[in-house]
């Protein structure tokens, strides 16, 4: 009997051992898939790590600086444009140290002839181009507007003159200041030499072309200013920007030669300052193009105003 009980207990123990072993095996097998399932999760996280990487943007390539200009630029012509040309060329050469600008003041006609002959790059004229000059290939580039001032010797008592009387003075039909309300004093008529842009513009605007009777014909704006200042009874015409306190400026028909009056079209004696080229600006070399670009820049406009001229509208 005792042997049967022992045998039964041994059997129960063996069954329990077998069941425990099976349970452990199943537990191990069940844990394995969890590990395998974790792997894809790690793999799925990888793209997030890649997306989180900082994006390095490429910097835009730096613009290449404009090529430095080297060479010469030759201008010639109007003496009235001296102040403008001197100020503009000095500033331009400071901005472009590789360029040398030369200017000869020979008068508008001579400057345009030199341009047509190909001996200069730009012909300066203080008047509009004539048809014959345009037919030679010269192109009119207006860079500024100038007023022509009528001046008299400082002791003169006349301060205003009509356009009609002014024309008569230059044609010799009025020869004494008393006929204009002034003192009994002969009028000494001073003007520019033939070929001068100032003379051409004055005579054309006053409609006295080839009809003037001059006491003296001088070859520069400065010479006219000095002669009128030192000659009792003298009258002359000069570029507005050179008028100083050595002379008096006359009103014409009651209108003073100011920028406002000129732009409004009220002042009769105004003319363009032209820098003519052979062909259009688009056909010029790089230095000539740079010169005109500079004139049209804010710096160039300030220079135009500083020398007493008006920027074209």
Regions found by a protein language model. Give the residues of each.
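C-terminal motif of bacterial Sec signal peptides marking the signal peptidase cleavage site
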Residues: 17-21
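Exported/periplasmic ABC-transporter solute-binding proteins
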Residues: 23-33, 40, 47, 53-55, ...
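Positively charged n-region of N-terminal signal peptides that target proteins for export
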Residues: 1-8
């Amino acid at each position: 009997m005792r042997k049967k009980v022992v045998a039964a207990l041994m059997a129960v123990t063996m069954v329990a051992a077998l069941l425990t072993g099976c349970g452990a095996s199943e537990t191990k097998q069940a844990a394995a898939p969890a590990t395998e399932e974790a792997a894809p999760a790690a793999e799925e996280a990888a793209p997030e790590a890649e997306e989180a990487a900082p994006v390095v943007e490429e910097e835009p390539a730096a613009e290449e600086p404009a090529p430095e200009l080297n060479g010469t630029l030759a201008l010639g012509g109007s003496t009235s444009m001296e102040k403008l040309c001197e100020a503009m060329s000095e500033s331009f050469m400071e901005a472009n140290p590789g360029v040398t600008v030369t200017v000869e003041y020979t008068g508008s006609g001579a400057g345009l002839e030199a341009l047509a002959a190909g001996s200069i790059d730009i012909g300066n004229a203080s008047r509009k181009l004539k048809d014959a000059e345009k037919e030679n290939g010269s192109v009119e580039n207006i860079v500024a507007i100038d007023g022509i001032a009528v001046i008299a010797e400082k002791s003169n008592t006349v301060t205003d003159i009509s356009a009609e009387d002014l024309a008569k003075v230059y044609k010799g039909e009025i020869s004494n200041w008393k006929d204009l309300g002034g003192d009994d004093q002969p009028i000494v008529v001073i003007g520019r030499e033939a070929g001068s842009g100032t003379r051409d513009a004055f005579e054309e605007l006053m409609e006295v072309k080839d009809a003037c009777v001059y006491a003296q014909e001088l070859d520069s704006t400065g010479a006219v200013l000095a002669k009128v200042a030192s000659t009792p009874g003298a009258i002359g015409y000069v570029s507005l920007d050179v008028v100083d306190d050595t002379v008096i400026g006359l009103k014409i028909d009651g209108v003073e030669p100011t920028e406002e009056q000129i732009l409004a079209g009220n002042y009769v004696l105004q003319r363009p300052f032209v820098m003519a080229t052979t062909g259009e600006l688009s056909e010029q070399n790089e230095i000539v193009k740079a010169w005109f670009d500079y004139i049209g820049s804010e710096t160039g406009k300030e220079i135009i105003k500083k020398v007493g001229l008006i920027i074209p509208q």
